Amino acid sequence: MAATHTLPLASPGMARICLYGDLQRFGRRIDLRVKTGAEAIRALATQLPAFRQKLSDGWYQVRIAGRDVSTSGLTAQLHETLPDGAVIHIVPRVAGAKSGGVFQIVLGAAAIAGSFFTAGATLAAWGAAIGAGGMTGILFSLGASMVLGGVAQMLAPKARTPRIQTTDNGKQNTYFSSLDNMVAQGNVLPVLYGEMRVGSRVVSQEISTADEGDGGQVVVIGR
C-alpha cells in the first residue's frame, strides 16, 4: 500500500494593516500573509525599526477584525487566529483618552511587547504546554510575570537623582548670596585650603528673628 509523504502546508490568509496619523509615513495600507495580529505587528517592527520606535512612544487604538483591543486582553487578542481578509487598524490617540470610554486604547510599547511575547507560538500551544503538568504551568506563570514585570519596569519613569544646583523643591540654592551655596543631601562636599574664590557649600543653617518689642524674644523661623 503506497503511503503519501506530504505535509500540510496551508499558508495563512492575507491580512491588511491600515495605519493612520503619523504612522502613515510607513505606508497607509500594508498587506501581509500572517496568522495573527501579533505576527503583523512583529513583521512591521522587525522590518521597520523606525516604526517600532514610533509605536513605542504613544497610545493607540488597535482594532483587529472589527474588535478593539483592550489593555487587559492585549496579549490574548494579539495572538488570536485571524480570519482570511482581516483588517487591522492602528490609530494614534492622545494619552488622556484612555480614561474616556468610547474606545479602548493601549500603550504602543505594550503592543510591541505583546507581539514578541510568545515568539511566534500560538495560544493553543501554550495551553497544551500548561495542561501537560502542574510544574509546567508554574514555570509558565513565573516566566510571564518576569516578562510583563520587565515591560512595566521599562515603562516606569526613572527617579531623578539630586543635583548640586537644586534643592528638593526644585529652586536654586541661593540662601546667602547670588552664588549657589547649598548642596542637596548625599552630594560630595569639597574640602578647600587657603583663600576661596568660589561659592561656599553650607552644611547647616539656622535663620532666626528677634522681636525687639517683646523683650528681645528670639523666634526661630527656619533651620
From Swiss-Prot:
One of its GO terms (biological process) is viral tail assembly. Keywords: Host cytoplasm, Late protein, Viral release from host cell, Viral tail assembly. It is found in: Host cytoplasm. The lineage of its organism: Viruses, Duplodnaviria, Heunggongvirae, Uroviricota, Caudoviricetes. One of its GO terms (cellular component) is host cell cytoplasm. The gene is I. Plays a role in distal tail tip complex assembly. The tail tip complex is assembled successively with three tail tip proteins J, one tail tip protein I, one tail tip protein L and one tail tip protein K. The tail tip complex interacts with tail measure protein to initiate tail tube assembly. The formation of the tail tip complex is completed by the addition of tail tip protein M, which is followed by tail tube polymerization. May be excluded form tail tip during maturation and would be absent from virions. The keyword Manganese does not apply. Its main location: host cell. It comes from the Viruses. This is Tail tip assembly protein I. InterPro entries: Beta-grasp_dom_sf, Phage_lambda_tail_I. Belongs to the lambda-like tail tip protein I family.
